[in-house]
Amino acid sequence: MITKEATVIVPTTGNRGALLAYSVGSIQKQTLRNIEIFIIGDGVTDEARETIKKLGKEDSRIRFFDHPKHERRGEPYRHQALQEAKGRIICYLCDRDLMLPNHIETMSELLTDYNFASTTYIDVRADQSLNISQYIGYYGPASETKKGQFKAGISLSNTGHTLELYHHLPFGWRTTPKNYFTDIYMWSQFHSLPECNAYSHTEPTIMYFKRGHFPGASVAEREKDLARWAPEITSERNIELIKAEAFKGLLTERQQLRIYKRNVKKTNILIRGYQVSKVPAKILQMASILLKKL
């Protein structure tokens, strides 16, 4: 029975409890308050377990689903938890990311007219520089012509869908085969449904700390990054300044890319026998997918 506007799934594993004070804390500070928070434990340590239990005692909206370590990322545990969800919509947050205060409210509005939606995110780099990323330009019903956009990948934290649509999926969250990205594998199920009506929003509502930007970073180092940014997103003025800085980063990167492309076109480098300027889109797409795995 639907009694909440949103259920938020927060997967966590190992000894990452120190991050939850910040990631879950950003959920607790959402402008939309009628929510429930499901923390999905995938082999957490005793220390992390105590941290999660403490969070639950302080906020009755939090529920903890404690499981042993799964062979992948505990995907079936998410499915089990969603059988008990009471939210009209389902949102997600990686335990290393932060929600801007309006994220769930934004998703709630989008998922009134659509049943699958994504926002963009503010990409935080290792040097603390900012960018805006992951606008995939996907609108309307799922179709074969838009399949590539789904394959481009949407991160967990900036994706949401209705609970009703989830219950129409053939499988729901399930163990991801080796060499597949967990999120892309899951979102492809939504794409397979004729009733999937998706929307890509341009507004950044997540602060995203990509694992690849912080190679080998310890939990303590990640905690420092979250501690640095979490207080900054509690004021509207600061958030607007952060967005402006991220937009500047996006424009700067685009300009650098244009300069790079001009220089590359002047070289004699061949890619699979093609001049760089004439490389087929399929090869470039494959290269993009491989780079994302780094």
Question: Which stretches of residues belong to each language-model region?
Answer:
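Nucleotide-sugar donor-binding/catalytic module of glycosyltransferases
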Residues: M1-Q255, R262
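Boundary detector for helix-to-coil junctions that initiate low-complexity/charged tails
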Residues: K243-L294
